Regions:
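Conserved aromatic
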Residues: 93, 300-303, 336
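Nucleotide-sugar donor-binding catalytic core of glycosyltransferases
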Residues: 2-268, 272, 276-294, 339-340
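Residues within well-ordered alpha-helical secondary structure of globular protein domains
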Residues: 250, 312-315, 335
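A charged, aromatic-enriched C-terminal amphipathic alpha-helix characteristic of glycosyltransferases
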Residues: 317-341
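A short acidic/histidine/glycine-rich donor-binding loop in glycosyltransferase catalytic cores
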Residues: 293-301
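C-terminal "capping" alpha-helix adjacent to the active site of nucleotide-linked donor transferases
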Residues: 301-321
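Alpha-helical elements of Rossmann-like donor-binding domains used by nucleotide-donor carbohydrate transfer enzymes
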Residues: 21, 25, 211, 308-312, ...
């Protein structure tokens, strides 16, 4: 049984992809475990619509009372504001789980000097582990590396005794809405798709798109490379998230690079629509992890590798691609990486 009462403390300003992932996962779990009860502050601007708000949202005062009685509180990082004060006022750190979706931003996560500064504790800006939350919260889930204190890490005393408080890898996952247009028996009619909102950070986005376009033109593949935009705050292209989900559902091979961190929602949108994926080196888990060991994932370290993988996957589309053959692995991916996993 999963008869827990869970309060989700959302960011104070704007929405957050990571928080959306948590809310979607809880709503999916509730379908399987009706005894599960979760609530969040109704002012949070999630993308799930009015019915979701009516079912799970609470006015601020009511949410405070719910949180007092909750078994678990999930405190979500917010780029523009994290509500640490809410937990402090309740004096509820002993039942608070911190989910850290922070990222360094732009393409700075590629910089080895900055990586070293994070390990040494010199860098304390956006994207660095929150040492205070490590000490206060029984569990700390984190979207981006590092997941441990490193060679300079402090030890913290907990109810379990003296031990090094590590962080649990918790990347974004496959949300239920990503698969809204996917139909298992429907034939896909787009060979390659490379859709990005902006192409400056990292520039790999621009170059992989251009290489994909040239490759498809040369080899007669159907290609989609229109830019996407995110509503309601940022507009950079003609395709909204809703439209992009429809495109992924029609796509055989998706192109992915890192975003403002190693992780990106695009990676999970592509996998969620039963596509093959050519992805920049996946660095979400520890080096010996097999969490993403799937045949459909073709990785590249540089543009030379990317071109090689384009040729390899293109040949597979010509001679060996059968959509039905992907279904068994697709179900395993959903089992391990959907938001309810």
């Amino acid at each position: 049984m999963m008869d827990y009462r869970i309060g989700v403390i959302t960011p104070t300003e704007r929405d957050d992809f990571y928080c959306d992932t948590v809310l979607d996962g809880l709503s999916e779990l509730k379908k399987e475990h009706p005894g599960l009860e979760f609530r969040y502050p109704e002012y949070y601007p999630h993308p799930f619509g009015g019915d979701f708000k009516a079912r799970y949202g609470l006015a601020k005062d009511t949410f405070v009372e719910f949180a007092r009685q909750a078994d678990v509180l999930i405190l979500s990082y917010g780029k523009y504001g994290t509500d640490f004060e809410f937990v402090e006022n309740l004096n509820a750190w002993d039942k608070t789980v911190y989910v850290d979706g922070s990222e360094i931003g732009k393409d700075k996560w590629r910089d080895p000097t900055l990586q070293y500064q994070i390990i040494s504790g010199e860098y304390k800006g956006r994207g660095a582990p929150n040492k205070e939350m490590q000490k206060k919260c029984p569990l700390y889930f984190r979207r981006e590396k590092p997941y441990a204190n490193g060679i300079y890490g402090e030890r913290s005393r907990t109810t379990c005794g003296e031990r090094s408080r590590t962080m649990i890898p918790f990347p974004l996952g496959i949300e239920s809405r990503f698969m809204r247009y996917y139909e298992p028996g429907k034939k896909k009619d787009i060979d390659f798709s490379a859709m990005f909102g902006q192409e400056l950070y990292p520039l790999t986005r621009r170059y992989t798109r251009e290489l994909t376009e040239a490759f498809c033109k040369k080899n007669g593949f159907v290609c989609h490379t229109e830019k996407t935009y995110r509503l309601p705050l940022i507009k950079r292209g003609p395709y909204s998230p809703e439209k992009s989900y429809e495109i992924w559902a029609r796509t055989k091979v998706g192109i992915c690079t890192g975003a403002a961190g190693y992780d990106s929602r695009r990676f999970w949108e592509i996998l969620g629509n039963n596509c093959l994926i050519i992805a920049e080196r996946i660095d979400l888990y520890e080096p010996d992890s097999d969490a993403l060991n799937f045949k459909r994932i073709f990785q590249y370290n540089n543009l030379y590798d990317f071109e090689y993988q384009l040729e390899k996957v293109g040949e597979f589309l010509r001679s060996g691609y059968n959509q039905e053959d992907l279904e068994e692995e697709y179900q395993e991916i959903l089992k391990r990486h959907s938001t309810r996993a």
